[in-house]
């Protein structure tokens, strides 16, 4: 694939968060497939996308978190969970009650996806995640 084609393919991939469904719905899937992107290249881009979205995590809105939750369904959910928990444990107190509840809900969904994937499941990470959810929800109720 030429450099220019690689850039165009990556732009499409990032625009739709790697989702073939969304590419198809918007009429860009056939164009994307013409670039013959390898699965290995897509894995590299997914990793870049996860890093980008983690850098965009905010207690002011939850768009990046929502995208990460969606990505966890077809990518390394455990790695996404690890990064979301790291951010949340440091920053969740900055958010209002609504944001705290949304974060708890999304983290729970990522936990479910992590358990479904069941690749070398780290129970310590799951337990830390549940502890963070409990602590955050107690804070909301107080």
Name each model-derived stretch.
Residues 1-75, 107-112, 123-140:
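Extended repeat-based scaffolds of very large eukaryotic assembly and lipid-transport proteins
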């Amino acid at each position: 694939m030429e450099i220019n084609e690689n850039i165009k393919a990556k732009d499409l991939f990032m625009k739709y968060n790697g989702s073939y469904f969304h590419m198809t719905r918007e009429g860009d899937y056939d164009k994307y497939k013409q670039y013959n992107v390898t699965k290995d290249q897509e894995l590299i881009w997914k990793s870049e996308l996860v890093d980008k979205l983690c850098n965009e995590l905010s207690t002011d809105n939850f768009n990046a978190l929502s995208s990460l939750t969606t990505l966890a369904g077809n990518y390394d959910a455990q790695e996404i969970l690890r990064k979301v928990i790291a951010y949340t444990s440091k920053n969740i107190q900055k958010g209002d009650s609504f944001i705290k509840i949304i974060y708890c809900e999304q983290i729970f969904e990522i936990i479910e996806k992590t358990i479904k994937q069941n690749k070398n499941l780290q129970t310590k990470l799951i337990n830390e995640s549940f502890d963070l959810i409990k602590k955050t929800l107690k804070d909301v109720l107080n």
